[in-house]
Amino acid sequence: MRLKIGFILRSLLVVGSFLGLVVLWSSLTPRPDDPSPLSRMREDRDVNDPMPNRGGNGLAPGEDRFKPVVPWPHVEGVEVDLESIRRINKAKNEQEHHAGGDSQKDIMQRQYLTFKPQTFTYHDPVLRPGILGNFEPKEPEPPGVVGGPGEKAKPLVLGPEFKQAIQASIKEFGFNMVASDMISLDRSVNDLRQEECKYWHYDENLLTSSVVIVFHNEGWSTLMRTVHSVIKRTPRKYLAEIVLIDDFSNKEHLKEKLDEYIKLWNGLVKVFRNERREGLIQARSIGAQKAKLGQVLIYLDAHCEVAVNWYAPLVAPISKDRTICTVPLIDVINGNTYEIIPQGGGDEDGYARGAWDWSMLWKRVPLTPQEKRLRKTKTEPYRSPAMAGGLFAIEREFFFELGLYDPGLQIWGGENFEISYKIWQCGGKLLFVPCSRVGHIYRLEGWQGNPPPIYVGSSPTLKNYVRVVEVWWDEYKDYFYASRPESQALPYGDISELKKFREDHNCKSFKWFMEEIAYDITSHYPLPPKNVDWGEIRGFETAYCIDSMGKTNGGFVELGPCHRMGGNQLFRINEANQLMQYDQCLTKGADGSKVMITHCNLNEFKEWQYFKNLHRFTHIPSGKCLDRSEVLHQVFISNCDSSKTTQKWEMNNIHSV
C-alpha cells in the first residue's frame, strides 16, 4: 500500500511539473495582438521624449539619421557623397509651431544638418601688454647666412652685368631668379607687425595644420624658400605636413631633384604630381584631398615667406570656431630685390578689406569705422567680405562640407570670390588677421606667363566669373553684366548642383551679404548704370578700332587693328553718358584734344553721347566730335564736320566664347 501511495505521489509531481511548464511556455509565447518588448521600451522612452511626434530613432517620420550635407568626392579614402548635396533639408519640413516662429531646437536641428557642430574646446587669446607672448621667439631670429645678401629682407640690387640674365629669368619665371638664387633659403626677415602683436598669449591647444602649396614650373629658390620659411617659423608640434602639388610642371629641377631634396625632412614634406595640368583652382582641391594629417588646411602660393609668429594668430580663430576662415596680412616681396614691405592702401594702420568692382576685379578698401568698433584692440582679427585667394587657412572638414572649390571653375580667377561668398552666405566668417603676416612675390612685367592647356578653351577666367555671379549674386548679377556685357551669352556649364547646395544649406541672399557684410562696397564702387551700347569702337568701314593698349589712369588711347577679342578694345557707353572700359573712363587730355583713359566714378566724366544712326560720338562739354588719325593712330576730339569720314564710328557688340 505504501508502494502504491509513493508511486501515486511521484506521478502527480511529474504531471504537475509538466503542466506548470506548459503554462509558463504559453505565457511567454507572443500573441498577434501583444505589443513587443521593444515597442514597450519605446513607449516608456517616449513618455520623457521632448519631441513626441518624432520617430523611434529620435527623428521626424521619414527622416534619415544625420549625414553631412556635403559634396565630398571619394578620393584617396576620403569619404564624400556627391549625391548628398541633393538631399532636401529636412528641417524645412518640421511642423510649424503654434507660436509661428522656429524653436531653438528647430534652429539647432537646421544648423546640425548644415555643418557639423563645434567639438574642439579652445580659449580666447589674451593681450598682456608688456609681457611677451607665449609664442614669441625669446631670441632674435638667426640669419640664414651671417651678413648674407637679403638677410632681414634687405634689398639685393645687382649690377648691370646681370641685366641679360635677370631679364631672361623674369621672362621665364616672372621674378629675378638671379637675385633669388643668391639669397639663403633660410634667410631672416623683417617684422612688420604692430608692436601690440608681440603681447598676445594664445591657448596652446591649437589645431594642427597641413600646409598646401601648388606650383607649376616655379623657380627653385622661390619655391624652396617658401617651404623653408614654413618649417623655420612654425612650431613643429602643430605642423602636420607640407603638401606640394606639382601641377604638371616640365622643368627638370622640379622632378628628381625635388624628390631627393625633400627627403631631408623625413616625410614631413610630400610631393604629389598631377597627370595633366589642372590649374591652380582644382589643384588646390586636389591638395585638400591629399593632405590628411592636419586639422586645418593652410594654403600658400609657391613664392611666399611666412613671418615671425605667423601660425598661432592665424589658427587660433579657427580653433575657437571651425566655421571661421582666416587670411594673413599679405606683405609685398619685391620680385627684383626681395625686399619685404607692407602692402599699400588701407587705413592709417595699413588695414584693408577685400573687395571687388562690378567687373569683378579684385580691390582693397580701407577698414571701416564700423569694423573698428567691433574690436577692442587694433590687432584683433577683423571681418572682410572677400579674400585675394592665394593665402588662407580653413578647417579641413569645413572646407569639404563647403564642397571645396566649384569643380566647374578652371585654371585661375574668381575662386577667391566663390569661396568668400560661400563662406559668408552659408553661415561662416572670413577674418583678416593683422598679427599673422606673410610676404608674397608678385609677378613682374615681362613674364611670358603659363598659358592654359588646350582642353580648357578660351576665356576661362571670364567663364569663372559668370559661374560665380550666376550662383551667388542673385539679382545683383545684372550689374556684372552691365560692366562685362561681352559675357552675357558666354556658356558657363551646369550650375544646378551649386544652386542646390545653396538651398540645402539655407544660404543667405546676396542682398543680405551686401547689406550686412559688404556694406561699404557700393560707396567705393557704385552700382553701374545700364548700358546704351557696347562693343568695339571701329572706324566706320575701316579695320581700325580704338584700343586702350593696356593703359590706365591717364594714358592715351590709340587706334589699332580690330581683333574682335574684346579686352583693350571693348568699351561701353552708359545712361550716365560715360564711355568706359572696366573702371576707366574716356575723357579729353590736358592738351584739350587727345583722348585719354583714366579711373572714374559715377559722378565723373559724363561727357559722351552716341548717335548710332549718324555714326558719331559727341563730346558734350566741348560740343566737338570724336576723331582719329589713321596715319598717326591717334584718337582726339575736333570740330564736328559731317563730311569727315574720320569722325564716323560704329559700335559693334562682341561676345566672348
Curated annotation (Swiss-Prot):
Expression by tissue: Widely expressed. Expressed in uterus, retina, kidney, small intestine, omentum, stomach and CNS.
Entry cofactors: Mn(2+)
Pathway(s) this gene product operates in, as recorded in its UniProt entry: Protein modification; protein glycosylation
EC number in record: 2.4.1.41
The species this protein was found in: Homo sapiens (Human)
Region feature (Catalytic subdomain B): 381-443
Protein name as annotated: N-acetylgalactosaminyltransferase 7
PANTHER family, A to Z: N-ACETYLGALACTOSAMINYLTRANSFERASE, N-ACETYLGALACTOSAMINYLTRANSFERASE 7
Keyword Transferase on entry: yes
Gene Ontology molecular function terms on file: carbohydrate binding; metal ion binding; polypeptide N-acetylgalactosaminyltransferase activity
Encoding gene (name): GALNT7
GO cellular-component term (any): Golgi membrane
Region feature Catalytic subdomain A, mapped onto this chain: 206-317
